[in-house]
Regions:
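ATP-binding glycine-rich loop module of kinase domains
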Residues: 44-79
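Conserved activation segment of eukaryotic-like protein kinases, specifically the C-terminal portion
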Residues: 207-221
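Conserved small/polar residues in nucleotide/adenosyl-binding loops
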Residues: 296-297
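Conserved HxN/HPN-centered segment at the entrance to the catalytic loop
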Residues: 91-100
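Catalytic-loop of the protein kinase fold
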Residues: 149-175
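Conserved short submotifs of the Hanks-type protein kinase catalytic core
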Residues: 105-119
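Conserved catalytic-loop aspartate of Hanks-type protein kinases
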Residues: 233
């Protein structure tokens, strides 16, 4: 199950979240203030829960998403950087609002806003695969990844790209999506979730310290053949474009041009998929922005 569920549940604005939680989060017993509604996802290194914050006066706020990450797994650092940037006043259109992030013993606990909507996976399943996604939704997805790549630097810091490393249909939340033949695909917002294995790019590094990912969407360098970079996420964006156009994941190890032809993808879109998913990072689009612009012009 994904973070975006129960679309009838009310949500709160950023200001409401901050004002309502500020007093309670000053307590040293924060964990005791959260009621776990249910577990959304569990792995060997991370548990994702749907929680409500129980106030001292008996009221509650929520829902929120809480991630409890094993600190020994060396993941989750992007949440800490995002939290610091948001507390410093930065706002991100395509990333979740973090309301609490701290280390407790050997865990990193992250509490964030609950995003209403449906995953890209569910959206394509509901509406079907169509080239309209490339014209309407996909440029917004490239903008969202570009926002991540711009980094989380605050005043006085040098900005460095944040590489998601696990872009896939279940980690993209779309709100208010609707499709008609006359209007095409319309939607309200698009948010990237699950920054657990995201990492900051390091100049001079030869390879990533921790290797994770989802096989159809992960480039070769993510498995020890070099350091991941913004072009690694461009590879995943190419795979996401293939998914939007076909409704299926690309098959690793098979020629992408042949896969596109077999699915009847228009040549201009197939060119974008194949260039994005080139095995050599140097042959891919240089940025998410460049990929997005190639679909507009």
């Amino acid at each position: 199950m994904m973070e975006a569920m129960d679309t009838q549940t009310p949500t709160y604005s950023n200001d409401e979240l901050t004002a309502a939680l500020a007093e309670h989060l000053a307590s040293l017993d924060r964990d005791d203030s959260y009621r776990v509604e249910r577990v959304l996802k569990r792995s060997s290194v991370e548990t994702t829960e749907l929680v409500y914050f129980e106030g001292t006066g008996g009221g509650s706020l929520g829902p929120f998403v809480r991630k409890r990450i094993d600190a020994s797994a060396q993941i989750g650092g992007a949440y800490e950087r995002l939290f610091a940037a948001q507390r410093a006043g930065r706002r991100f259109e395509h990333l979740p609002r973090i309301v609490d992030c701290r280390r407790v013993g050997d865990e990193l606990n992250v509490v964030m806003e609950y995003i209403e909507g449906e995953t890209l996976e569910a959206l394509v399943d509901r509406l079907g695969a169509t080239p309209d996604y490339a014209r309407e939704l996909y440029p917004a997805l490239c903008d969202a990844v570009g926002e991540l790549h711009a980094g989380f630097a605050i005043a006085g810091e040098t900005s460095a790209p944040v590489i998601h490393r696990d872009l896939k249909p279940s980690n993209i939340i779309v709100t208010g999506a609707n499709y008609t033949p006359d209007d095409g695909l319309t939607f309200s917002s698009l948010v990237i979730i699950d920054l657990g294995i995201a990492r900051v790019w390091r100049d001079g590094a030869d390879a990533d310290t921790v290797k994770f990912g989802t096989r159809p969407y992960a480039p070769p360098e993510q498995y020890g053949f070099g350091q991941t970079s913004v072009r690694s996420d461009v590879y995943a964006l190419g795979a996401l474009l293939f998914f939007c156009l076909t409704g299926v994941d690309p098959k690793p190890g098979l020629d992408m041009r042949e896969q596109c032809e077999a699915r009847g993808i228009p040549t201009s879109l197939a060119d974008a998929v194949c260039m994005s998913m080139a095995l050599d990072p140097a042959k891919r689009f240089a940025s998410a922005e460049a990929l997005g612009l190639s679909l507009i012009h």
